[in-house]
Amino acid sequence: MTTASPSQVRQNYHQDSEAAINRQINLELYASYVYLSMSYYFDRDDVALKNFAKYFLHQSHEEREHAERLMKLQNQRGGRIFLQDIKKPDRDDWENGLTAMECALCLERSVNQSLLELHKLATEKNDPHLCDFIETHYLNEQVEAIKELGDHITNLRKMGAPGSGMAEYLFDKHTLGHSES
């Protein structure tokens, strides 16, 4: 393996930030992988909640786009991308819509915490460009995603999920079926 040659465009980009960006890329790809697993679980013939499937597929694509945006940043700043193995999702059977939404909320909170730590590191390394990038492209979107998932969980519980299959069916049809996702 050859070592990467030093970048001619690198300026005020600390090695710790570069490494943290690579870790964040891996986390975003992991999140995409988890959402992909959720999507195809709900697409199964014995689950058949097509709007849950569409919702989670959309989330998977968003997370992959987040990873790609970070890769582009890494190259723009003169860093080097070092991809790691992507961990498999903790489960293959997502049980029901409520459980999947709860797992998604936990995942989004984890991604958000990692982004907050990345922002803190960028602040400590006096990297205003990285701070602005994270603020502009990630932080508000994470807060909105966390709120949306929290709302979905609340509404599913109010409807009687997971005990009521009808609740999931109606939520799939009327809430997720009419969302922008």
Swiss-Prot record:
The keyword Metal-binding applies. Fe cation 2 binds at E63, E108, Q142. InterPro entries: Ferritin, Ferritin-like, Ferritin-like_diiron, Ferritin-like_SF, Ferritin_CS, Ferritin_DPS_dom. Fe cation 1 binds at E28, E63, H66. The modification N-acetylmethionine is found at M1. One of its GO terms (molecular function) is ferroxidase activity. The modification N-acetylthreonine is found at T2. The modification Phosphoserine is found at S179. It is an enzyme of class 1 (oxidoreductase). Its EC number is 1.16.3.1. Its main location: cytoplasm. Stores iron in a soluble, non-toxic, readily available form. Important for iron homeostasis. Has ferroxidase activity. Iron is taken up in the ferrous form and deposited as ferric hydroxides after oxidation. Also plays a role in delivery of iron to cells. Mediates iron uptake in capsule cells of the developing kidney. Delivery to lysosomes is mediated by the cargo receptor NCOA4 for autophagic degradation and release of iron. Belongs to the ferritin family. This is Ferritin heavy chain. It comes from Bos taurus.
